[in-house]
A protein has these predicted regions:
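A short beta-strand element within the Helicase C-terminal
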Residues: 458, 465-480, 506-509
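Post-DEXD/H (motif II) to motif III coupling segment of the RecA-like Helicase ATP-binding lobe
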Residues: 292-293, 300-363, 528
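Conserved helicase ATPase core of P-loop NTP-dependent helicases/translocases
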Residues: 250-253, 258-259, 412, 419-423, ...
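Conserved helix-turn-beta segment of the N-terminal RecA-like "Helicase ATP-binding" lobe
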Residues: 231-257
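Conserved SF2 helicase motif VI
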Residues: 202, 325, 482-507, 524
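Extended alpha-helical interface modules used as scaffolds for assembling large macromolecular complexes
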Residues: 1-168
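Conserved interdomain hinge at the start of the Helicase C-terminal
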Residues: 377-416, 422-423
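Walker A/P-loop
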Residues: 195-216
Length: 546
């Protein structure tokens, strides 16, 4: 009975990290439990209904969940909790949406009292039509997304089996010459295609773009791809031309600068959410063609207005790609209802073990503020506090020491405050990429960095998303936006790309001791711990010692 896990009746799970079975246990509970806190020795997970439903949709059943809890638990698992897990998972799929030859879209139940209960809800009434028989009610087709959101909030997630329109056919094949989809990418495509719609969770660097290409090859239809920014749009285009039968002319870019609508169109979230006089002129892009597949890249960053529109796209196949289902705004349930449940997830560590991602060494370096800085920090206004501790002069010394230590290796210095980055750039004699850097200059510097012409690059937040800097071996983070976990995932993903020479990747986070900087850092580590990375904490003095 000496397992690594303590299961508590409030649905929190405590995992003892140093236990020999901790790693196996983490793999077993990862599909259904969400990590909440991850300090050094004990990690806290929580079991939520949404987590259980996502697991259910990805093909895990209640028996597996119960087995995992019982097998690894140190003490007997509270019986009520096991019953609750089974009942919660059993709620998924008691209501199904499907097509009806006469009535169009219908909601059917296998459990009549559930239908009675939800039909009494004032929120459901306007979304449904006539009662066809005791177990079936008609739903207005335009409310397909809305009713799924509403039912989820009521605790009865509906399984959507209403099928999809095929969209306009367009020939797309994978051009597998000298390469092929990796086993987990194939499984991800199959999981998605079988489920029809939903989210594939894969770490950065594990080739999410190829999963997208695989899905497009299955759909063989016109495709709309939504990405975070223009650079990322160009990367998708480059990758698709290389890996599929598509040509440059078949792929359009719909961004701030270009408005091309082609059989495969890549649009940025930014352009879709641009408002003019309170309306979103570009949202009609969704209706501009009969799309057979819509791909949402980095689905955890999907802006709220796009959700509203996605609710109307329920008849189209939707594939979400992401490294994390955690959203900073807590709208995970909308991803579940509107894009679809999780269809596949591969733990980073397993992919790493297959050699597809270079294993990373994550280190937090704690620096002390000088006496005058501590005084300034103590008397700073609350909103200025983070800036004060994030830009301490000691961080510069540590960064310089680290850059020196890894001289000759491709090193990224990442931060948020422009003046801090400019100063670092000057001291390290390295170019700085920031918000105002033109796209052209940005691409030029990235290329120089890729080819190894420059080995140190200082980047501000702009480099966070979907930009391939394949040969960065070392990342040094000096300041970041207020401890967002998503950001940590993106940043780590930048460096964790597989290295041609099997080099180990290093990720350093430079943090000011005893300040809110340290609290934010703790928040960000959660994500890394969730993925099974060890996070060492070292003192700056040790690093600076000759």
């Amino acid at each position: 009975m000496n397992g690594p896990l303590i299961v508590q009746s409030d649905k929190t799970l405590l995992l003892e990290v140093d236990h020999e079975l901790a790693e196996a246990c983490r793999r077993a509970i990862a599909p259904f439990a969400e990590l909440e806190r991850a300090p050094e020795h004990i990690h806290t997970y929580r079991v939520t209904p949404l987590g259980l439903w996502n697991a259910r949709a990805a093909g895990h059943d209640a028996e597996q969940v119960v087995d995992a809890l019982v097998e690894y638990s140190r003490y007997p698992v509270p019986h009520a909790l096991l019953v609750d897990v089974a009942e919660t998972m059993d709620r998924y799929g008691r209501l199904t949406l499907s097509k009806h030859p006469v009535h169009g879209l219908v909601l059917t139940t296998t459990d009549r009292p559930v239908l009675e209960e939800i039909l009494r809800s004032k929120k459901v009434q306007p979304l449904v039509g006539e009662r066809i028989d005791p177990d079936t009610v008609a739903v207005h087709p335009s409310e397909r997304g809305q009713i799924k959101q509403t039912l989820l909030k009521l605790g009865w997630p509906a399984e959507d089996l209403a099928g999809y329109v095929d969209g306009e056919a367009h020939r797309i094949d994978l051009a597998e010459d000298g390469w092929s989809l990796r086993p987990y990418q194939k499984q991800a495509v199959e999981g998605f295609w079988h489920g029809g719609s939903g989210v594939v969770v894969l770490p950065c660097g594990a080739g999410k773009t190829l999963v997208g290409a695989g899905a497009m090859a299955e759909a063989k239809a016109t495709t709309l791809i939504l990405v975070t920014n223009t650079v990322s749009a160009r990367q998708w285009k480059h990758e698709l031309v290389k890996r599929t039968s598509l040509t440059e002319d078949e792929i359009g870019e719909y961004s701030g600068t270009k408005k091309e609508i082609r059989p495969v169109t890549i649009a940025t979230y930014q352009v879709l959410t641009t408002r003019r006089k309170g309306v979103y002129p570009h949202l009609e892009l969704f209706d501009s063609r009969d799309w057979g597949l819509i791909v949402y890249d980095e689905v955890h960053l999907l802006p709220a207005p796009v959700f509203k529109f996605t609710a109307d796209l329920q008849a189209r196949r939707r594939l979400g790609l992401t490294a994390t289902l955690v959203r900073e705004d807590g709208r995970e349930s909308d991803v579940f209802s509107l894009i679809g449940p999780k269809r596949f997830d591969a733990p980073w560590k397993e992919i790493e073990a297959q050699g597809y991602i270079a294993p990373a060494d994550c280190v937090e370096v704690r620096v002390n503020l000088t006496d005058s800085e501590r005084l300034a920090y103590a008397t700073a206004e609350p909103e200025e506090k983070y800036r004060f501790c994030a830009t301490t002069a000691t961080k510069r010394k540590v960064t310089e020491a680290l850059v020196k230590r890894f001289a000759g290796q491709q090193t990224l210095v990442i931060g948020q405050y422009i003046d801090q980055l400019d100063e670092l750039g000057e001291h390290l004699d390295a170019p700085v990429i920031k918000g105002e850097t033109s796209n052209k200059e940005r691409e030029r510097l990235f290329d120089a960095f890729r080819t190894g012409e420059i080995s140190v690059l200082v980047v501000s937040k702009v480099a966070n998303f979907s930009i391939d800097l394949p040969e960065a071996t070392v990342a040094i983070q000096v300041s970041g936006t207020f401890g967002s976990r998503q950001e940590e995932a993106q940043r780590l993903g930048r460096v964790l790309r597989p290295k041609a020479d099997g080099h180990q990747a290093h990720f350093y986070s430079v943090v000011a001791r005893d300040t809110i900087d340290q609290d934010f850092a703790a928040h960000r580590q959660r994500f890394l711990a969730e993925q099974g990375y060890a996070y060492r904490i070292v003192d700056a003095d040790e690093l600076l010692a000759p």
